[in-house]
Design a protein with these regions (language model features):
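Gly-rich Lys/Arg/Thr-decorated short loops/hinges at beta-loop-alpha junctions or inter-strand turns
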Residues: 30-38, 98-109, 262
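Aromatic/hydrophobic pocket-lining residues that form π-stacking "cages" and hydrophobic walls in ligand
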Residues: 55, 151, 209
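Short, amphipathic alpha-helical interaction segments embedded in low-complexity terminal/linker regions
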Residues: 208, 213-307
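Residues at the C-terminal ends
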Residues: 61-62, 157
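Cofactor-/ligand-binding subdomain signature composed of acidic, glycine-rich
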Residues: 1-41, 45
């Protein structure tokens, strides 16, 4: 029988032993204190997270994909982070992919037995044509989920680089992956409920990996989302504001530049800063491999120049 008590994520938290007698304020104070400890645990693994960013960027730049895979909360967090990449960074939904044991149904309803199948983890990657250009990131709070173990084993056999994110040190998935990221947020306020601190920690790390990788491949200029997709009124205005913020131009000029660029924010920025048409701006961006800073290097205008 599996001994869960050896996992810190399954142990009892001594600070919440009387959780059922606490007032509401005591409950939230205890949870907040424990959340702070969880956040602090990420500090110890920042060098590994930085390596993960570099590996993800390298995979994307060579035409590969990044796969997140997990079960339950871990799987849902991977799907959540992956699904935010297209609207935020203007990338294809096939570029960063979240896989959850049991498929889409498992996102809202538990699928019995799905996480216990190593073969399911392998087959989910096989069905998506995994290649050695790709990167696979396995997520499991316990660090032992069979679905993730099987996926990582298949990925390694395919020649992929692999990363494991677990909330226990010396985890099974960590030992099998090329890179182990193992923060230790400690026992949960509600014993074994890894949707809490363990989930928070995993989400923080995924935020860093996806954001950092997108910065590295040119999806960000300064600290602005210059590849944001303008899919609603708010994002249309945001696109205009970004062009205005970067170039110092008027809204009227930003609107026109975006129209000429087919709504592509980066092209609009470069066209204003280089005082060229959208086609020329697109060429400059292509030569710079999509990096705005490189495309406009030495050509930045003062606000007065671009009104």
């Amino acid at each position: 029988m599996l001994d869960l008590t050896k996992f810190t994520t399954e142990q009892r938290n001594q600070k919440s032993m009387d959780l059922d007698t606490m007032t509401s304020l005591q409950i939230v104070t205890t949870m907040n204190d424990e959340d702070l400890r969880a956040v602090q645990s990420v500090t110890k693994v920042l060098p590994q997270v930085a390596t993960a960013i570099d590996w993800a960027a390298e995979a994307l730049e060579r035409g590969g994909r990044v796969f997140y895979m997990g079960a339950g909360t871990s799987g849902r967090l991977g799907v959540l982070d992956a699904s935010e990449c297209p609207p935020t960074f203007g990338v294809s939904p096939d570029l960063v992919v979240g896989l959850i044991a049991g498929g889409e149904t498992a996102f809202i309803k538990a699928v019995e037995g799905a996480e216990d199948s190593e073969e399911l983890g392998a087959s989910d990657l096989r069905e998506r044509g995994l290649s050695d250009k790709d990167l696979v990131v396995g997520l499991a709070a316990s660090g032992r989920t069979p679905y993730v173990v099987g996926g990582l084993a298949y990925a390694k056999a395919t020649g992929c680089k692999t990363i494991a994110i677990a909330c226990n040190q010396g985890s099974k998935i960590g030992e099998s992956a090329d890179l182990a990221i193992e923060p230790v947020p400690g026992p949960e306020v509600l014993t074994g409920s890894t949707r809490l601190k363990a989930g928070t920690v995993q989400k923080l790390i995924l935020n860093m990996i996806s954001t950092g990788a997108m910065v590295k491949i040119g999806k960000v200029y300064q600290n602005l989302m210059v590849d944001v997709q303008q899919t609603n009124e708010k994002l249309v205005v945001r696109g205009q504001n970004i062009v205005m913020e970067v170039t110092g131009c008027t809204r009227e000029r930003a609107v026109q530049a975006l129209a000429d660029a087919g709504g592509h924010v980066k092209t609009a920025i470069v066209s204003v800063l280089l005082d060229c048409d959208a086609a020329q701006a697109a060429v400059a961006l292509e030569r710079a491999h999509g990096h705005v800073r490189t495309a406009v290097s030495g050509h930045e205008k003062s606000n007065a120049d671009v009104q």
